[in-house]
Amino acid sequence: MRPLVFDNRFVRELPADPETGPHTRQVAGASYSRVNPTPVAAPHLVAHSAEVAALLGWDESDIASPEFAEVFGGNRLLDGMEPYAACYGGHQFGNWAGQLGDGRAITLGEVLNGQGGRWELQLKGAGPTPYSRRADGRAVLRSSIREFLCSEAMHHLGVPTTRALSLVGTGEKVVRDMFYDGNPQAEPGAIVCRVAPSFIRFGNFELLAARGDLDLLNRLIDFTIARDFPGIEGSARDKRARWFETVCARTATMVAHWMRVGFVHGVMNTDNMSILGLTIDYGPYGWVDNFDPGWTPNTTDAGGRRYRFGHQPRIANWNLLQLANALFPAFGSTEALQAGLNTYAEVYDRESRAMTAAKLGLAALADADLPMVDALHGWMKRAEVDMTLFFRALAEVDLLKPDPALFLDAFYDDAKRLETAEEFSGWLRLYADRCRQEGLDADQRRARMNAANPRYVMRNYLAQQAIDAAEQGDYGPVRSLLDVMRRPYDEQPERAAYAQRRPDWARERAGCSMLSCSS
């Protein structure tokens, strides 16, 4: 493998835990703990992203090197790597949880590529760290496949996200109780190499504020601005104000994209919120099949549904408020923080309107259009309509003669389709009238809509089918699914099977409809 150029500013410029090794402990006055990955028995490459490899300056010959699986399976380090686990806290399901930290993620270092980019490499499932608590620091193949595939699928959908370089099987078993019901099972282990410019989270700042460590809080703020937001200029006070405003704006844009494509994160705790506004920590996520703002894929959240699909914009705002509370001791006033929170609301409204307009083939969404949108969403929920298939079919409607039959494949329940048929026909006529005001020809309208409405999304049942095969040693379906998701807006006629609505067998199956945090 060609050597990588490392410039590990996080470990160079921020204080380290004076203790080393993976034994569990409370870590104060430090941003990270030095810890090495724990070697595994038989690392082997399951899948990789050629696009992410290219970001690092590598090609297929580097990936094919026997050294690759050894490095990204945690068995050896490259020159320049300085492994560590980060220290942070967070609010989990609305409650302060204290110190959390990287319990099974180990950052290897920060790579500089030839285009001026900085990419942090992080192994997830690489063994115990000081933050593992009572866990083993490992990850199962099941959850690792889901994280690897969704990281790349989201990127190709145009959603801000962390990336994934590789998925490496460990040759070892990991014991997990998938639904916390007292039935633990031994499952194949795996390690994902996650890649992002930064893995700093809201929780990094929250823990320092909760502990009253104002000195390190100020250092972390200044470090984050200097390394991760180099375009922000001005006085120290102005930089901080613009930085928080930027964090709020990026978070708003990220969540608006989630809502556009039907993604439900599942566990929007503040320790799972990226300071860069990237989707991070793909655990019990899900994709909306039949449109339902109240749906959550996370069994842990099944009662309160705090992180349900339609609640995500509000939760992101709440999480930013917790970040603002943590930053207040360093900012000294609420003015800049409130301005940032106001920016979140403004940017989310603007981006959400623009994306909804694009999904409907409109140039812009006026206030007068909102009742039409609300009526559509209400009907979609009542009629149990597949979100992805519906919007893709909507691009094919003949505005002069709209035909409801075009949408037959999008319905999950024929009785509900018939019950709501008149309501939908009325909406479709209203929509056609509105579209005719745009003055676009059919091809222009279709192109606008198909650029906003994916044909292919990482449906849970598709991921589960790939997992089932991989657990039997067949990695072909994982690689095929990754390849389909590289072009989610293209028709890909030879891959139409990946664009089908959720089959009946997957409606209640574990891993296809509901998931847990067990991974």
UniProtKB/Swiss-Prot annotation:
GO MF terms held by the record: AMPylase activity; ATP binding; magnesium ion binding
The keyword NADP appears for this protein: no
InterPro entries found in the cross-reference section: SelO
UniProt KW keywords: ATP-binding, Magnesium, Manganese, Metal-binding, Nucleotide-binding, Nucleotidyltransferase, Transferase
Main EC class the enzyme belongs to: transferase
Reactions catalysed: L-seryl-[protein] + ATP = 3-O-(5'-adenylyl)-L-seryl-[protein] + diphosphate; L-threonyl-[protein] + ATP = 3-O-(5'-adenylyl)-L-threonyl-[protein] + diphosphate; L-tyrosyl-[protein] + ATP = O-(5'-adenylyl)-L-tyrosyl-[protein] + diphosphate; L-histidyl-[protein] + UTP = N(tele)-(5'-uridylyl)-L-histidyl-[protein] + diphosphate
Pfam families hit by this protein: SelO
Cofactor: Mg(2+); Mn(2+)
Positions annotated as active site in the UniProt record: D271 (proton acceptor)
Entry's family note: Belongs to the SELO family.
Name of the protein in its database record: Protein nucleotidyltransferase YdiU
Gene of this entry: ydiU
